[in-house]
Regions:
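Flexible, glycine-rich linker and terminal segments associated
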Residues: 35-58, 171-205, 211-217, 230-238, ...
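Bacterial N-terminal signal peptides
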Residues: 21-28
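Repeated loop/turn-to-beta-strand initiation elements of outer-membrane beta-barrel proteins
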Residues: 60-63, 91-99, 125-135, 160-165, ...
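N-terminal secretory signal peptides that target proteins for export/translocation
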Residues: 1-15
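Residues on the lipid-exposed face of transmembrane beta-strands in outer-membrane beta-barrel proteins
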Residues: 83-87, 118-122, 137, 152-158, ...
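Residues that define the transmembrane beta-barrel architecture of outer-membrane proteins
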Residues: 61, 75-83, 95, 112-118, ...
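Outer membrane beta-barrel translocator domains of Type V secretion systems
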Residues: 37-125, 130-142
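Transmembrane beta-strands of outer-membrane beta-barrel pores
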Residues: 69-73, 103-109, 122-124, 139-143, ...
Length: 312
């Protein structure tokens, strides 16, 4: 038992070391890209793409297009595309009622799916505008196979740190797809995020998640560590590592480019400089009223057969 404990501990330490090395490499790439960004080459390209993005969804508000690559460390990368919009319904200086919606691709058991999400949210600032609290509800659906899910979320966000919690509840029956029984799982997650010290153009996020399996021996659980980097007002690059707590489950890596419209002129980017004189730059809380909700738009699906696996 002691030997097993030591092995698991060493394995966990190796995972953490790899996470820090990857974040260091990502930041180093940011340093190397800084000269190019200052020369405005990347900025001009991202602004051009951003203006094109603005035409995809009508109305005023945040519009994002993501291109991401998921790597399972076994040479099976998955490319996913996502378009997301946030639109105000009733807003003023201290509160906001809004809708958020997205359409994206997801690979489930080698099969490309189209996943739709639509939600309604409410956010409010406290009296001195130092904190924002909010709640939201979402409906998620696999447009091809009719898997369905509801979620409820809570947010508490301050000038230098954000927290949110999401609970997901499946509402559809099992579906037979290509001879396999598929089941959407219920579960929950939390997110805690803040900027790296003296780098206001970065955000480091820790997510803990757990989804209740139906037939698999263990629930799907783990932690996701992500580094989000705002390169220009219109372009961000994210690196995340999904560290599973399930025995025998490999880590997943995700690399994402996000084009945003309108450009985030009120948020620090790498264009403003690699470092700041202030350790933590306080964010404008009114701007956070119009941010997207941080949640998992992918469905977590258990594929039941001779061997039961889970895709998320």
């Amino acid at each position: 038992h002691f030997g097993s404990f030591v092995y698991k501990k060493n394995n966990k330490n190796k995972k953490m070391i790899r996470i820090f090395i990857t974040c260091f490499i990502a930041l180093s790439l940011g340093v190397n890209a800084h000269a190019d960004i200052k020369g405005s080459t990347l900025n001009k390209i991202s602004e051009k793409v951003s203006s094109t993005v603005s035409n995809l969804i009508p109305g005023e508000g945040l519009t994002e297009v993501d291109i991401s690559i998921r790597d399972d460390n076994e040479g099976n990368p998955e490319v996913q595309f996502d378009i997301l919009g946030v639109r105000d319904l009733i807003d003023n200086e201290n509160s906001n009622v809004f809708t958020q919606f997205s359409l994206h691709s997801q690979d489930v058991n080698g099969d490309k799916r189209a996943i739709g999400n639509i939600g309604l949210g409410y956010r409010e600032l406290n009296a001195d505008q130092s904190m924002m609290i909010g709640g939201n509800i979402f409906y998620d659906v696999d447009l091809f196979e009719q898997h369905q899910r509801l979620s409820m979320g809570l947010e508490a966000r301050a000038a230098i740190i954000d927290f949110n919690y999401n609970y997901y509840q499946e509402i559809s029956n099992n579906q037979i797809v290509d001879g396999f029984n598929e089941k959407v799982l219920s579960g929950q997650e939390y997110n805690l995020s803040s900027q790296l010290p003296y780098m206001p153009w970065t955000t480091f996020n820790i997510q803990g998640y757990r989804f209740e399996n139906e037939k698999a021996a263990q629930d799907t659980k783990g932690n996701i560590y992500s580094l989000e980097m705002a390169l220009t007002p219109s372009l961000a690059f994210d690196v995340e590592n999904d560290v599973s707590s399930v025995d025998g489950q490999d880590d997943m890596w995700n690399y994402r480019l996000t084009f945003t419209h309108p450009p985030r002129t009120n948020k620090a980017t790498l264009m403003d400089g690699l470092t700041s004189d202030v350790a933590f730059v306080k964010a404008n809380m009114q701007d956070k009223l119009k941010d997207k909700v941080r949640r998992n738009n992918n469905l977590v699906v258990e594929i039941q057969g001779a061997v039961t696996i889970t895709k998320k």
